[in-house]
Amino acid sequence: MEDYRAQFIDIYNKNVTRPGADRLLKWLEGTDFFTAPASTKFHGACECGLVMHSINVYNAMMQHFFTEGEDNPETFAVCALLHDVCKANFYKVSTRNVKNDATGQWEKVPFYQVADQLPYGHGEKSVYLIEHFMRLKTDEAIAST
């Protein structure tokens, strides 16, 4: 299994250098950001899915949209890596009963459930959380919503 946490931190530390970036990363490390899913049913609905999704968005943005000498690498890293920070501490693992087709027995299986502690709009919540630690440019805030 890839070490998505190390990949994320490497990209983040190389690109995100503005005041407060270190405090934001420390906060992320105190949450489940690096182990949480990105969703309950769709993309990244697995352990570490959130950090994996964030890295995938970063790689896609850099490959398809970044122009060296024109674009700001920090802005791309901030927008891609942090667009879903609102999903940190957003899911919890619960269990439900599912019938095993082979045995006919009911079994408890884990699944991800939303446990929203801060009911705020999805993109707006990411901006709100980021801004606790570091300032965003207007275009970064808009791109994250």
What label would you give each PLM region?
Residues 1-36:
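Non-catalytic interface/linker regions that flank or bridge core catalytic/transmembrane domains
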Residues 23-30, 43-55:
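All-alpha helical catalytic cores of prenyl diphosphate-utilizing isoprenoid enzymes
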